[in-house]
Design a protein with these regions (language model features):
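SAM-dependent Rossmann-like transferase core, predominantly class I methyltransferases
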Residues: 151-185
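C-terminal catalytic and target-recognition region of SAM-dependent MTase-like enzymes
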Residues: 287-289, 293-376
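Non-catalytic nucleic-acid substrate-recognition regions in nucleic-acid-modifying enzymes
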Residues: 2-136, 376
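Flexible, glycine-/basic-rich loop-and-beta segments that form/coincide
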Residues: 53-55, 158-163, 167, 373-376
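Short beta-strand/turn micro-motifs composed of small residues
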Residues: 10, 258, 338
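Conserved S-adenosyl-L-methionine
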Residues: 174-291, 307-308, 312-314
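A short, flexible beta-alpha/helix-coil linker loop
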Residues: 100-103, 159, 304-308
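C-terminal edge-of-domain segments
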Residues: 140-156, 367
Length: 376
């Protein structure tokens, strides 16, 4: 097979960014939908998306798309799918997925039906009555929504947010894909001073450094499809070499600070693993008291929400103190994500713009202060 259809699930609110990334990578037929981005391409496009995407969650190869309201229709739809094109005779093919607003709502039953249909199809195509499943893992995923069944092959393995640089996070880490999106939404290109005053495990500064250097986030991790029989190993080598050639080597001003010394130590270790330690400075500091690190720049942060790390009232007091401290920081653009619906009130001024994003399952707003207006 030389041409495929792919689906890239995204955190809600990031679909447009992921679509733009795919287009910049030269990938064809990109279509943006709610919660995902679709594209067409060959194994090289698949590898490029896995290695280079910053805001997508994983890369799924679309195997089938059909309607089913009964288990028999589900079985027949899977049985008609050319699974032998992507799963070899000894391949291991576990099944997982989800159901929503459909006649078929039992995930375990749907898993069993899909597994049975896939086994029958592959057994007949390979002329065997029993499949050993001792070889490479080919993870099948299904989505049943409004009686529409979509069957996928996961080409990523661990989610794309797992860059490989964060072995251990702090108590409430920010997802790497969301951090990258937050940086992208500031239009940062490596020329401004970037400061995260609540850096935690360093995710925002690290993602900013990866963007500044144009360093592919998946350069040093492995992907499930690297072991697929129908993907030439040279594809991955070529994609990584091309990404390496496009990296920039400049001097960048990126600072991460936190009032917890343990977070600073963790951030330094993570930056080293990400290969960007030379681009970032980390230091202890109270965000509401420390001096501004430069006359102008971009502040990007994920302060405590009052849901996991602090009580809500304490978080609100923190927002007010931060607003007072930054009141005269006219040279700084400020980008702050929080689930607090009254953030602007506590911070002391209205945002120039705000955008709805999700941090895990938490619905948030990304407040963007891009002018020098000080009033509420």
């Amino acid at each position: 097979m030389s041409n495929f259809e792919f689906s890239v699930p995204c955190l809600f609110g990031l679909e447009g960014l992921a679509g733009d990334e795919l287009r910049r990578l030269g990938i064809e037929n990109v279509r943006v939908e709610n919660g995902r981005v679709l594209f067409s391409g060959d194994a090289r496009a698949m590898a490029k998306a896995n290695v280079c995407l910053r805001t997508g969650e994983r890369v799924l190869l679309t195997l089938a798309d059909f309607k089913a309201t009964t288990f028999e229709e589900l079985f027949q739809g899977v049985y008609r799918t050319n699974l032998e094109d992507v799963i070899p005779k000894d391949g291991t093919f576990p099944v997982k997925g989800h159901c929503l607003n459909s006649q078929l709502m039992s995930v375990p039953d749907c898993q069993a039906i899909i597994k049975k249909a896939a086994s029958k199809r592959l057994g007949e195509k390979y002329g065997v009555s029993w499949l050993p499943e001792t070889g490479t893992k080919y993870q099948l995923q299904f989505s049943i929504m409004n009686d529409r069944v979509q069957l996928f092959l996961d080409t990523s393995g661990p989610g794309l947010h797992k860059r490989g640089y964060r072995a251990v996070g702090n108590e409430a880490p920010l997802r790497e894909t969301l951090a990258a999106a937050m940086v992208q939404l500031t239009k940062y290109r490596g020329r401004d001073f970037v400061w995260d005053p609540f850096c935690g495990s360093g995710t925002i500064p690290i993602e900013a450094a990866l963007i500044a250097k144009n360093k592919a986030p998946g350069m040093y991790r492995r992907f499930a499809s690297e072991a697929f029989a129908w993907v030439e190993p040279s594809v991955w080598g070529d994609v990584r070499a091309e990404a390496k050639d496009k990296e920039f080597n400049g001097k960048y001003q990126i600072l991460g600070s936190d009032n917890d010394p343990k977070c600073i130590s963790l951030s330094i270790a993570n930056a080293r693993k990400a290969g960007v330690a030379d681009c970032i400075s980390f230091r202890d500091g109270d965000a509401t008291k420390m001096d501004l690190p430069a006359q102008s720049g971009i502040l990007i942060c994920n302060p405590p929400y009052g849901q996991r790390m602090m009580e809500q009232r304490s978080a609100q007091q923190l927002y007010a103190a931060l607003g007072r401290h930054l009141k005269f920081a006219d040279g700084w653009k400020k980008y702050i994500i929080t689930s607090e619906p009254e953030f602007e009130h506590y911070f002391g001024r209205r945002a120039t713009k705000k955008r709805k994003l999700y941090n895990g399952m938490i619905k948030c707003d990304y407040y963007m202060y891009t002018d020098n207006q000080r009033k509420k």
